């Protein structure tokens, strides 16, 4: 049996009439009208998240880039980021002409707070917290440390739509929250992203820089005074979202709660099953964290490199694509592959974790019976790998 764990859910039927209408009109550009689908998406997403403002753009990476530019940091300023994230995050920092500083990440996939505090020096001008694969670092400590030094915090919540921390929605804790609409995320437009903030100056700067040229910022329905002071003073990066993408996302907003709930159900059912084996460890979330996962990560305990490779090979034979972050050639989540950075930092915990951390997509559309079968295949693959290595 082979499980297709990469195909997304179908776009809800309610989007189809509006898609047909826009295909007939050809009106794909967001600024052709006052209340375009992109504008409506921004309003609806902000309301859903409890934020004052939202800006939809071409990707989560674009949202992070624009957010960093909007902070008006000096060129080359240092930005603290986790050592475990997707390559797009340090890339966005570099794109904003800033310097990433990587924090060591523990075996539970969350930032090591001792290393975070040690590296939060006077040279650090901003922090990007990547909730990688939906795992939330200690936001209470992060915010307390950063607030004490007046350092802005940006949340990369690409994997964390639907997650809460002490009941507060992830993406609303820092100064800015950035989300993804890429196909493997909770909301699927193929590509796309959105940022949220309560800061009027931040939203004005990001709107203009996203490509609201001339006076197109007026179509966002916000205070003219704030935008007026930035008119013609900021570069235009043209990272706008199209109306077609916005229609796809708007139709899925009503699915967020259900997908988050079902994703957590599937994750916890599989975690409970495979954690019965002493060779597999599924780190528990931090107490304030209520997750909305669409994948599962687990660690191989006391495995050699050969045994780890044998396990992933056995999983592939069984029809499930389990991968190990650090053992995939060129994996974009392994910090030593970010060769566009100057030098490779010493992150011993992160390196050790990546060499034994397994990754498996677990879409919310799966049934509990399918999840149970996947668990059986993981456990049987484990035994098969152990037997092969012992032979």
How would you label these PLM feature ranges?
Residues 1-70, 74, 147, 355, ...:
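Conserved PLP-binding active-site segment in aminotransferase class I/II-type PLP enzymes
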Residues 65-119, 128, 315:
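Conserved PLP-anchoring active-site segment centered on the Schiff-base-forming lysine
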Residues 108-189, 194-202:
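Active-site phosphate-binding strand-loop segment of PLP-dependent enzymes
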Residues 160-166, 173-295:
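Active-site region of PLP-dependent enzymes
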Residues 214-225, 269-272, 311-358, 387-390:
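Conserved PLP cofactor-binding pocket of PLP-dependent enzymes
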Residues 286, 293-304, 333-342, 355-369:
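Conserved PLP-binding active-site segment of the aspartate aminotransferase-like
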């Amino acid at each position: 049996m082979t499980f297709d764990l990469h195909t997304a859910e179908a776009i809800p039927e309610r989007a189809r009439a509006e898609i047909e209408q826009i295909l007939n009109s050809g009106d794909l550009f967001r600024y052709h009208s006052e209340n375009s689908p992109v504008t409506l998406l921004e309003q609806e997403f902000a309301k859903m998240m409890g934020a004052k403002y939202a800006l939809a753009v071409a990707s989560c990476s674009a949202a992070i880039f624009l957010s960093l530019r909007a902070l008006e940091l000096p060129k080359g300023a240092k930005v603290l980021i986790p050592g475990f994230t997707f390559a797009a995050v340090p890339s966005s920092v570099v794109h904003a002409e800033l310097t990433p500083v990587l924090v060591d990440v523990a075996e539970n996939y969350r930032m090591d707070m001792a290393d975070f505090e040690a590296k939060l020096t006077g040279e650090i001008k901003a922090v990007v917290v990547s909730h990688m694969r939906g795992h939330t670092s200690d936001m209470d400590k992060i915010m307390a440390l950063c607030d004490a030094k007046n350092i802005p915090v940006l949340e990369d919540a690409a994997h964390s739509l639907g997650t809460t921390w002490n009941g507060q929605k992830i993406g609303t804790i820092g100064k800015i929250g950035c989300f993804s609409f890429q196909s493997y995320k909770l909301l699927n437009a193929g590509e796309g992203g959105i940022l949220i903030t309560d800061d009027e100056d931040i939203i004005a700067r990001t709107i203009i820089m996203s490509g609201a040229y001339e006076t197109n910022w007026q179509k966002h329905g916000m205070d003219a005074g704030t935008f007026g002071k930035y008119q013609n003073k900021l570069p235009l990066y043209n990272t706008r979202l199209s109306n077609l993408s916005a229609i796809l996302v708007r139709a899925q907003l009503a699915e967020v709660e259900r997908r988050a709930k079902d994703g957590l159900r599937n994750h916890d059912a599989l975690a409970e099953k495979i954690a019965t084996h002493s060779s597999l460890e599924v780190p528990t979330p931090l107490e304030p964290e209520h997750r909305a996962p669409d994948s599962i990560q687990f660690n191989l305990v006391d495995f050699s490199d050969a045994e780890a490779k044998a396990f992933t090979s056995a999983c592939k034979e069984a029809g499930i694509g389990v991968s190990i972050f650090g053992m995939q050639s060129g994996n974009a989540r392994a910090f030593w592959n970010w060769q566009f950075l100057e030098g490779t930092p010493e992150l011993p915990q992160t390196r050790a974790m990546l060499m034994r951390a397994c990754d498996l997509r677990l879409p919310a559309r799966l049934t509990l019976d399918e999840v149970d079968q996947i668990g059986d295949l993981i456990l049987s693959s484990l035994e098969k790998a152990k037997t092969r290595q012992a032979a």
